[in-house]
Amino acid sequence: FLFVAIATLSVKAQDIYMGGTVGLWRNDDANTTSFKLAPEIGYNLSEQWALGVELQFNHEYKEHISTNTFAIAPYARFSYYENKIVRLFIDGGFGFATTKVKDGGDAINGFEIGLKPGIAIKLNQHFSLVAKCGFLGYKDDYMNNSGFGFSASSEDLTFGFHYEF
């Protein structure tokens, strides 16, 4: 217990970041609506390495069928280039997701393991705009996707923010 207390007190607030992404999409022609909320928290171990976790909630309504997905995705972030404004990084991690169709059968559980490249643009001392695009790795029933490969489509593009304390 004493070790945990000392370790907790030694964490500097300035090394913690929080943020996330939010998305909303509506297609009237296809009668489809989707919503995504993905908060994120992390800890900078050094100037190049960070550990973090992203939680996700996705809701999709398509052709009178509602689907909810919950996911947790811990990662290790390696920042391989940084100047005063731009930081390029790659997240290596794994995620677990469970998807449930409302009024449907059993939940579908899946996982992913892989790499996601990203960029952070520093807006001021505390706020950064963050974008991630692409995935290289393996998915098994993770958010309705399975298989091994690489993707870099607009469906993989996310924008968010980070606040560094």
Predicted regions, residues:
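Sec-dependent N-terminal signal peptides
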Residues: F1-A7
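Sec/Tat signal peptide C-region and signal peptidase I cleavage site
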Residues: T8-A13
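Gram-negative (and chloroplast) outer-membrane scaffold detector with strong preference
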Residues: D15-I16, V22-L24, F35, E40-K116, ...
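Outer-membrane beta-barrel porins/channels
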Residues: K132, D141-M143, F148
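Short glycine/proline-enriched turn or capping motifs at secondary-structure junctions
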Residues: F148-F159
